[in-house]
Amino acid sequence: MRRGFTMLELVFVIVILGILASVAGVKIFATRDDALISRARSDIASIRGGIINKYNANMMVGRFGYPSSLEKSGSSVPFDGVIQNGAKDWTKSGNDYTFKLGSRSVVFTYDSANGTFDCSHSQSLCRALTE
């Protein structure tokens, strides 16, 4: 009686391991994107809350209005004027803030007249982040 595996048994094991690895790889990448979306949703909620906090602080000293900028004076870190350490994965251009997730991106616009921080809900990434 021979001890060991036949070539056919080894091929089956390799094929099964390949299938399992491909399924696991897809799940890992999807989980990573879900985590980044969750962090961005948290950032957006913090930013909106920070805008309201600045508005309330302005009211306490007799100035009625939303902050004119979401950054501290002279700072290049997005949102450090409304949340403590700013936010990662965001870039700023004027009053527009871009969040990138892989090859997709969405632009949020801050309107200091009414304190809104929002994006175009026709984009799927915007809906994933705000709804």
What are these regions (language model features)?
Residues N56-S112:
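Extracellular/periplasmic head regions of type IV pilus-like filament subunits
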Residues A35-G62:
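Membrane-proximal N-terminal amphipathic helix
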Residues M7-E9, S69, K100, S124, ...:
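Acidic/proline-rich low-complexity IDRs
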Residues M1-T31:
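N-terminal single-pass transmembrane signal-anchor helix
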Residues T109-E131:
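Low-complexity, S/T/G/P-rich flexible repeat/linker segments used as non-globular hinges
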